[in-house]
């Protein structure tokens, strides 16, 4: 989907890879994409999203969420908004899109995220990536990014 949308994934330098490994379980995957796995508590989501926003080498985030009991959909939605607001207070803002999969509860969480400025879509990975691609095409056309 990223290639189709005109986006590319960066190769993580070793220090960034190690920074993500501090937060994810050994059976997760650092690198790009980062996979924290579905059984992680809210703090893991917060820490990895925060790291992605804080590191200047990362320009945007595509969040993929699958409904879990440990971090239910609305908990995920609210923690994403919380971390975004925390970073905005520090002057850090980056494009973020989200894909949520699961049952009808992910629809509510996607709507919550959307209402708080995060383009979020239930049951689709392609749409949020296409939205991010459109943002980048516009920004390139406006001369804001290369």
PLM feature spans:
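Short glycine-cluster motifs
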Residues: 1-66, 75
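Short Asp/Glu-rich motifs
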Residues: 21-22, 72, 108, 132
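Short, small-residue-enriched loops and turns at beta-alpha junctions
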Residues: 68-72, 103-104
């Amino acid at each position: 989907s990223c290639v189709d949308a005109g986006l590319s994934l960066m190769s993580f330098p070793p220090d960034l890879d190690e920074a993500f490994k501090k937060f994810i379980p050994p059976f997760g995957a650092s690198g790009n994409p980062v996979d924290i796995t579905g059984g992680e508590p809210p703090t893991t989501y917060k820490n990895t999203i925060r790291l992605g926003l804080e590191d200047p080498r990362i320009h945007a985030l595509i969040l993929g969420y699958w409904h879990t009991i440990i971090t239910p959909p609305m908990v995920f939605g609210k923690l994403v908004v919380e971390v975004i607001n925390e970073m905005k207070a520090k002057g850090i803002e980056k494009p973020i899109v989200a894909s949520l999969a699961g049952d009808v509860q992910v629809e509510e969480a996607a709507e919550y995220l959307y209402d708080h400025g995060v383009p979020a879509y239930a049951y689709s990975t392609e749409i949020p990536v296409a939205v991010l691609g459109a943002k980048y095409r516009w920004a390139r056309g406006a001369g804001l990014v290369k």
